[in-house]
């Protein structure tokens, strides 16, 4: 007794993408003969196993046969025929479905990852509201800066795929300090969030945060916020530009 296991597909386009990957053909230049044969073989196998075939699979089979027959017709000299590839519509549908499938998989992965986290209601930090500037001579509560750091960290974690990235080089505090210094050369102050594009590794966000703390302690930068939950700005400190 033989057991035949068939992959489950979400429609004929899903099956076609599977076959394209299986026989390693270019989706932009599909050899219709090979693809149609593989597709019809799959339909034939389902018939042999007496599996009920959805009508959409049969409709796609007829479309493939029609495209294949058009490809076999002799070429004409009419200009409009030169730009009319019978496969174009099929290729467009396959690419659109491929993008949709990739995005769906991405969202499902994010959903699984989000389920690992627990949310809490925002903490009332109104009692921390202040117009003070954090500088070496005027130390204030670091809660707001830590909250801003956490926002960046969360956005980076959401946008960055969870892959293992092996790198020989690491991003150092010295490099982060240089980036902040270069940014202050162009602007007297800048928004803390402008340091990030939210696709960088989380380690880089942590390094920037530590560098800014160190630069503030040294008087190279000041950290300013008008009131709680406002944007945090990085300004030139009293020791900015002083050789060390």
From Swiss-Prot:
Quaternary data: Component of a cohesin-like complex composed of ScpA, ScpB and the Smc homodimer, in which ScpA and ScpB bind to the head domain of Smc. The presence of the three proteins is required for the association of the complex with DNA.
Compartments where located: Cytoplasm
Name of this chain's protein: Segregation and condensation protein A
PANTHER family per UniProt: SEGREGATION AND CONDENSATION PROTEIN A
Source domain of life: Bacteria
Pfam family, one: SMC_ScpA
Gene designation: scpA
Functional summary from the UniProt entry: Participates in chromosomal partition during cell division. May act via the formation of a condensin-like complex containing Smc and ScpB that pull DNA away from mid-cell into both cell halves.
Sequence similarity: Belongs to the ScpA family.
GO biological process: cell division; chromosome segregation; DNA replication
One CC-aspect GO term: cytoplasm
UniProt keyword Cell division, yes or no: yes
Keywords, ordered alphabetically: Cell cycle, Cell division, Chromosome partition, Cytoplasm
InterPro entries the record matches: ScpA (IPR003768), ScpA-like_C (IPR023093)
């Amino acid at each position: 007794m033989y057991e035949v296991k068939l992959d489950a597909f979400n429609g004929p386009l899903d099956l076609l993408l599977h076959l394209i990957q299986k026989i390693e053909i270019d989706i932009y230049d599909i050899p219709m003969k090979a693809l149609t044969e593989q597709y019809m073989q799959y339909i034939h196998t389902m018939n042999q196993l007496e599996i009920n075939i959805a009508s959409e699979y049969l409709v796609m089979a007829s479309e493939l046969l029609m495209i294949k027959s058009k490809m076999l017709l002799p070429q004409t000299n009419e200009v409009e025929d030169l730009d009319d590839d019978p496969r174009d519509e099929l290729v467009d549908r396959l690419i659109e479905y491929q993008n949709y499938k990739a995005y769906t998989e991405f969202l499902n992965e994010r959903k699984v990852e989000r389920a690992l986290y627990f949310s809490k209601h925002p903490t009332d930090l109104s009692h921390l509201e202040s117009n003070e500037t954090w500088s070496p001579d005027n130390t204030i509560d670091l809660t707001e800066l830590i909250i801003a750091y956490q926002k960046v960290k969360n956005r980076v974690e959401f946008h960055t795929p969870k892959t293992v990235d092996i790198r020989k080089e690491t991003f150092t505090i010295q490099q982060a300090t240089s980036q902040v210094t270069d940014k202050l050369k162009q602007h007297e102050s800048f928004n803390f969030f402008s340091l990030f594009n939210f696709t960088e590794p989380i380690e880089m966000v942590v390094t920037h945060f530590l560098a800014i703390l160190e630069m503030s302690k040294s008087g190279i930068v000041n950290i300013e916020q008008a009131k709680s939950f406002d944007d945090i700005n990085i300004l030139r400190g009293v020791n900015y530009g002083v050789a060390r």
